[in-house]
């Protein structure tokens, strides 16, 4: 079985104005994460080279904050061009919050293949986890990305206290968007976060993967944050459940498994890794 690997570069971290209860990058909570306004381009390129060495096809440039402004847009475009020049065979993904059609067209010109902007959860449950912006504004950014000609990467977070009805509603909204890829994150509580809920079981997490693939058969289901913690020794069962991709290495503010360990285990299990996008 061939699967797709993606890596993340957190190129602007922390001090986000938004109050998303699940996020350690919010300025509304005190956490000990690294905070920086921008990462050096040379460091981003180095991380891209490491990602490629570890069999990644996708490389995501992530910035904290509500959305793109002129300065941030210019910086992300610079980063994309720098990576493209040195590692031309990576698929570049941008994850920079709210964005207009015009801004997203600029990202596409700079070499961005796909835009990631998660709905996070259902329209009904969203006000319980964020009050500083609306679910509708997130949905609109996804429509903007499609209009700009970008591929769409849109998913969310499970295990925040949402109901099964919320999960169904959330997946129906994703069906409207028909994203190229749909990331699944499993919420991991942090003592500094306002959101304190029981962790998902491995069985429940695998059911979420199956239900997502059933709802979105044409989308690449990508399991991202929380994979190692929630699923532990069962984490590679996600592929039998319908996943076609994982995020390798460090996540935004938490440690993932060392990429090489994932590669070793997956190769032992007979998996091969996508080197181009079909």
From Swiss-Prot:
Entry GO MF terms: 2 iron, 2 sulfur cluster binding; 4 iron, 4 sulfur cluster binding; biotin synthase activity; iron ion binding
Entry-linked Gene3D superfamilies: Aldolase class I
Signal peptide: none
GO BP, sorted A to Z: biotin biosynthetic process
Every Radical SAM core domain range: 1-227
Pathway assigned to this chain's UniProt record: Cofactor biosynthesis; biotin biosynthesis; biotin from 7,8-diaminononanoate: step 2/2
Residues that hold [2Fe-2S] cluster according to the record: 60, 95, 153
InterPro entries membership: Aldolase_TIM, BATS_dom, Biotin_synth/BioAB, Biotin_synthase, Elp3/MiaA/NifB-like_rSAM, rSAM
Enzymatic reactions: (4R,5S)-dethiobiotin + (sulfur carrier)-SH + 2 reduced [2Fe-2S]-[ferredoxin] + 2 S-adenosyl-L-methionine = (sulfur carrier)-H + biotin + 2 5'-deoxyadenosine + 2 L-methionine + 2 oxidized [2Fe-2S]-[ferredoxin]
EC number, as in UniProt: 2.8.1.6
Cofactor(s) for this UniProt protein: [4Fe-4S] cluster; [2Fe-2S] cluster
Cofactor, how bound (note): Binds 1 [4Fe-4S] cluster. The cluster is coordinated with 3 cysteines and an exchangeable S-adenosyl-L-methionine. Binds 1 [2Fe-2S] cluster. The cluster is coordinated with 3 cysteines and 1 arginine.
SMART domains registered for this protein in UniProt: BATS (SM00876), Elp3 (SM00729)
Alphabetic keyword roster: 2Fe-2S, 4Fe-4S, Biotin biosynthesis, Iron, Iron-sulfur, Metal-binding, S-adenosyl-L-methionine, Transferase
Residues that, per the record, bind [4Fe-4S] cluster: 16, 20, 23
Broad EC category: transferase
Biological role stated in the UniProt entry: Catalyzes the conversion of dethiobiotin (DTB) to biotin by the insertion of a sulfur atom into dethiobiotin via a radical-based mechanism.
PANTHER family to which the protein is assigned, alphabetical: BIOTIN SYNTHASE, BIOTIN SYNTHASE, MITOCHONDRIAL
Subunit structure, interactors included: Homodimer.
Entry similarity comment: Belongs to the radical SAM superfamily. Biotin synthase family.
The name this protein goes by in its record: Biotin synthase
Organism of derivation: Campylobacter jejuni subsp. jejuni serotype O:6 (strain 81116 / NCTC 11828)
